[in-house]
Design a protein with these regions (language model features):
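Conserved glycine-rich Rossmann-like NAD(P)H-binding loop of the short-chain dehydrogenase/reductase
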Residues: 65-79, 254-269
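Hydrophobic Val/Ile/Leu positions in short beta-strands of Rossmann-like dinucleotide-binding domains
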Residues: 44-47, 234, 258
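Glycine-rich phosphate-binding loop signature in dinucleotide/nucleotide-binding domains
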Residues: 98-99, 296-301
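NAD(P)H-binding Rossmann-fold N-terminus in SDR/SDR-like oxidoreductases
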Residues: 51-56, 240, 244, 313
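Flexible cofactor-recognition loop at the NAD(P)H-binding site
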Residues: 106-111, 142-143, 239, 305-314
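Glycine-rich nucleotide cofactor-binding loops and adjacent beta-alpha elements
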Residues: 1-226
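Conserved glycine-rich cofactor-binding loop
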Residues: 49-50, 231, 238-239
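The beta1-alpha1 cofactor-binding region of Rossmann-like NAD(H)/NADP(H)-dependent oxidoreductases
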Residues: 280-292
């Protein structure tokens, strides 16, 4: 879906006119494309003393293909990254900041007391202004409820307020999110980092994501098609946001069941055919809807995902 004012304000003439008239100039936000890298630019890595995730992060970055640079407080990263064949180097010289980067990531798993928070302050004090527009900020800690002492739990809980504040202060379409990684789940970081560092997370900021130990599910073989083999029902799929959601699900490899009211049958059939999915015309508020939905789901062998798009009713 296009935004006429957004496109105009970011054109050569529109940018000049909006500047003269004092009108807002919204940024063009990145959109995910399968032919682009997860992160278009370098990632600056920092960590608290005793950071526990450097080896898992090196493995994840090698798999994702992220180019990293190390903050001066994390000199051990360069040797570790080189062992994984990562392109890396040191960021900045003494107190002078280095080149602009696309993402910041801080490993806060080593924080056990608020007295150690100087490390995370120093990292963002040095680097916050060096993040490019549309960049990413990720902080990784340990779940507070799993901490061994009240002091450790307190400093880990405080990370949530920090990431939310960063998201508000940095602006320029920069997102800021917190990841709590449980003990024993370190090798599960890749999928979360792929999401948070990529344009997939353009509208996700100030959130807390928890990574626990796996319960049997396997990571997708093809990261470009993470929903391959899944069946997804999307309501309100004939137009607007519902249609856009259905397109994303199909792009990610899912078989899409497009549902909308019978009055929207023409548009529903069109998008289902275009996406290689199936159209299901019914009113989910009707008395017989539960039985019809159950019958349709059983006929498909079950649905893996249901996206209920709450639209605006037109009287």
């Amino acid at each position: 879906m296009s935004d006429s004012y957004l496109n105009f304000a970011n054109s050569a003439f529109g940018a000049k006119l909006t500047n003269v008239m004092g009108l807002p100039k919204p940024l063009l936000l990145a959109r995910y494309r399968t032919d682009q890298p997860v992160l278009s630019g370098s990632l600056l890595l920092g960590g608290a003393p005793g950071a526990q995730l450097l080896s898992p992060l090196a493995n994840a970055f090698a798999a994702i293909g992220v180019q990293t640079v190390a903050h001066r407080a994390l000199p051990q990263w360069v040797a570790l990254a080189n062992q994984q064949g990562l392109m890396t180097g040191r960021w900045g010289v003494e107190d002078q900041p280095g080149a602009k980067v696309k993402a910041l990531l801080f490993d806060a798993t080593g924080l056990t007391d608020s007295n150690q928070s100087e490390a995370i302050y120093q990292f963002f004090h040095d680097a916050a202004r060096s993040v490019l527009a549309g960049g990413r900020v990720v902080v990784i800690g340990r779940p507070p409820e799993s901490c061994s002492s009240p002091r450790q739990a307190t400093v880990q809980r405080a990370l949530e307020g920090l990431t939310r504040s960063l998201g508000k202060e940095l602006k320029r379409a920069i997102t800021s999110n917190l990841v709590y990684c449980a003990q024993g789940a370190e090798d599960q970081l890749e999928s979360t980092l792929r999401f948070l560092l990529s344009p997939r997370s353009t509208y996700v900021s100030g959130q807390v994501i928890r990574i626990g130990q796996p319960v049997g599910a396997q990571a997708p073989i093809d990261w470009a098609k993470p929903l391959a083999g899944k069946r997804v029902l999307v309501t309100g799929a004939s137009r607007g946001i519902g249609a856009a959601i259905a397109e994303v699900m199909a792009r990610d490899g899912a078989q899409v069941i497009c549902l909308d009211v019978p009055q929207a049958q023409p548009g529903l059939d069109e998008i289902a055919a275009r996406l290689g999915g199936r159209a299901l015309a019914m009113d989910i508020s009707a008395p017989d809807a539960p039985a019809l939905l159950t019958e349709a789901a059983l006929a498909d062998g079950g649905w893996d995902v249901l996206v209920h798009n709450a639209g605006i009713t037109r009287d």
